[in-house]
Each structure stands twice: as structure tokens, then as C-alpha cells.
Amino acid sequence: MQENRPVIALDFPEFSDVKDFLEKFDPSEQLYIKLGMELFYTAGPQVVYYVKSLGHSVFLDLKLHDIPNTVESSMHVLARLGVDMVNVHAAGGVEMMVAAKRGLEAGTPVGRQRPKLIAVTQLTSTSEEIMQNDQKIMTSLEESVINYAQKTAQAGLDGVVCSAHEVEKIKAATSKEFICLTPGIRPEGASKGDQKRVMTPKEARTIGSDYIVVGRPITQAKDPVASYHAIKAEWNR
């Protein structure tokens, strides 16, 4: 099922930046917010509690990648924060991903729904050349992504983070219900930044993405609220 709200990546260094940004929006508007490593390492759980207290959904983007026991215990803790989605690196392997899900299930308070758990396949900043030269994965980028997606599905996770360019083949290799969350989304004419594989909101919708993540085109816009609504309208067109 496609989420009708673009996920806003709040890649800010300070908690105060989050407050300043969210205060621009009408209090009645429920957003879907992505909180990443830098912000969580700086502000800790309080930033999650704050965003949730405003009625927004939270994707906590920490990309866990460690031994299974460590990931399981970490997910047990993260589940208590009330987040709506978390992630791991698929490169950690099936055993690690199974442990992550087990930790989430055990840590989710009674009466609450377990946070969605997705895995990163290849980062959108990774080109095939980088993958082959640095990671020594000597397949095509597409083959690597599909393999990771299949391993993620095998582990029982809800979906993957992937480029919109791979969505159709991932769903064909897993299932239509398998979530594809796609970063690297840029409105027509926007700068690509450090993203190698990008797509517009309209293109991502057409190709079957379930969630899109948009950061700088919203957070660095002259009018973030107007930019958000324009991207949301394009995504839902």
C-alpha cells in the first residue's frame, strides 16, 4: 500500500533545527519524518519523543549492521521509542535480519503495532563502479540489489530501501506487498546533490514505489511548506 505522504528527511545537526522546521507547519498536519544518525546521536531519544508528541510518524534511519545478538537487543530498545519504521543493512545477512525482527517484536509494547522493518540494499550514492571496485561485488548493481531484496524477504522483513529504478524488478522477485521505500527523489529541475540514482515523485509513483524520501528539496527550500505540498501533490497525482 502506497503511503500518501512523502517522508521528509530531517538531516539536521541539532534538535533545535527540528523544532524550527516543524513549527513552520500547521499543527493539524501529520507528517512522516525521517530522523537519521547525526541527529539521533546528537539529541538521542528525546527527538523521537518530541516528533511523536506532535502527532507525526517517524522513520528512524540508523541502518543497523552488527552481529545478530547486538542488533536484536538494539531493536528491542528502539521498539520502545514508538517509532513507525526502522532499518538495517541487508549486507548483515539473513540471520542478523531475523534477529532484528525478533528484537522488534519482543520490544514492542502490548497494544502497539510493531514498527515496520526494512533493509538497505545498496545506498543510492553507490554506483556500479563503486560497488565493484570498493566492495568487490562483481555482479551488476541491479543483481546485487535484487539479491539483497530476496534475502530480506526470506528473513521476513517488510521491505527494502532501494532506488526507484529497481522497484519493478524487486517486486517481481519478491511480492507486490513487499515495501519499496525510495530515497533519491528530486522534483523536476532540482539538484541531484550526492545522489547517483534519482527520480521525480511522479516517476516513482508510476513505477510502484510505496514510500518516497525527500530531504533538501523541502528542508532547504525558501518555502519548505509550499515545497512539501507541491511534492506531495506530484506524488499523489
Curated annotation (Swiss-Prot):
Signal peptide positions (record): none
UniProt entry keywords in alphabetical sequence: Decarboxylase, Lyase, Pyrimidine biosynthesis
Name of the top EC class for this enzyme: lyase
UniProt cross-references to SMART domains, sorted A to Z: OMPdecase (SM00934)
Disulfide bonds: none
TM annotation in the entry: none
GO molecular function: orotidine-5'-phosphate decarboxylase activity
Matches recorded under Pfam families: OMPdecase (PF00215)
EC number: 4.1.1.23
Residues at the catalytic site: 63
Quaternary structure and partners: Homodimer.
Protein name, entry field: Orotidine 5'-phosphate decarboxylase
Source species of the chain: Lactococcus lactis subsp. lactis (strain IL1403) (Streptococcus lactis)
Recorded name of the encoding gene: pyrF
